[in-house]
């Protein structure tokens, strides 16, 4: 038995280790909330939690701060009052009591140095170490990336620039900040690594600096950034000719390298790559769960398995979600809290590219396709309509997919033609095999016989699966279960429904797009960073809020938050 297997923690040991980190994150979150004047229920508002975590990630980003300080030195020559250390965070605050509760948007000022000081007091002084802040903030960045994937299909533009737009289902983690990308590599889709590799190949051709730098590789060696990217691609790629192609890229010429990467990406739509899936919740949700579970909290500190679904449900009972005026499609439309709850659920579990009919079979309420949703960007808007606790819950659970969906032997540009599984549940293949074959047939002929041989073998794998698509199943033998079926006694068979693709175009629904002209940009307040300044207007109606329904579920939590006066 390998040392790695011998040292593997038991589930109880793993939950205790998780709880240690999660509790430290919660305490740091509470302290920063208090620093910017948030108390009680306000700490449990989702949009506040997202804003605070974004501020933390930016304050811990050394390169961002270096650029900002450079701009500050230039700005100070023109404005002696400029403060490079000051940042503004846009938040939702509560006013009134009983049935006369209102919520309004404000911008609270604090400083980077103060946030860093708070983090050091809870996490230790070495914030630059991956084990101290890297993993914590990496998971925070992963949630933010999942959110953007659902709202904007963030990976589609990158996929279109670097190949075919259909490849966006391979771009999990496309929005993760560069600093955390390699820390979170095993949670990132192969399409993101392929896009990075193409960028490095282009940079080498154009003579850009940094493409030949020495970086750490696996097994303690060093090499170029391209070698590091190709190691990650080789590890994720489906076993067989795709991995052999990945090993050829570093030494191949420009055209061959790009073509090999295209083949790996396009074939990966069907020959599914490996990716590690975990549940990741914002810290405000972990705080909400801790307030409910109290002494039992440690037993629910899980990122996978049945308890991950349970702790998500528990957190959803206490958090508040804001409804603002203005959606992605219509500036005058009011956001739907039910739709935002669905987006939150899908972001926490990374479900943007999972079989949508499977996700729908696991939750308590009907779900919507993306183009039917009334949502904004999850930032704090100017006009708060309501703040409510969502009703959406999981009723079933399944193991997370940590293995290859298939074993090794086995013009619709921009539309979704494939799924990327999150849950290990037996299902038929949903990929449009014909479209994958069309993409692969674009590969040009080469005199390089070994590459041609590998391309031929990839096509053969695709053809075999295409001919036997109706008989082949992914995750053979795996099932989902009722949430109370802890021992997996009654497996539930799944049959894919009519809508396997979340981003499927719905011809029966054609929303009217209404976007108001942008207001003139007001003179920038030099004491507020760009972090939360987007959309802020000095003459706006910030603070002019409508009456809200009180959060009955949250009303009794204030006195339970540590350090609350």
From Swiss-Prot:
Compositionally biased region (Polar residues): 554-565
Taxonomic lineage from the root: Viruses, Riboviria, Orthornavirae, Negarnaviricota, Polyploviricotina
Protein name as catalogued: Nucleoprotein
Function description: Encapsidates the negative strand viral RNA, protecting it from nucleases. The encapsidated genomic RNA is termed the ribonucleoprotein (RNP) and serves as template for transcription and replication. The RNP needs to be localized in the host nucleus to start an infectious cycle, but is too large to diffuse through the nuclear pore complex. NP comprises at least 2 nuclear localization signals that are responsible for the active RNP import into the nucleus through cellular importin alpha/beta pathway.
Keywords: Capsid protein, Helical capsid protein, Host nucleus, Host-virus interaction, Ribonucleoprotein, RNA-binding, Viral nucleoprotein, Viral penetration into host nucleus, Virion, Virus entry into host cell
Region described as Disordered: 518-565
GO molecular function, one term: structural molecule activity
Subcellular location: Virion; Host nucleus
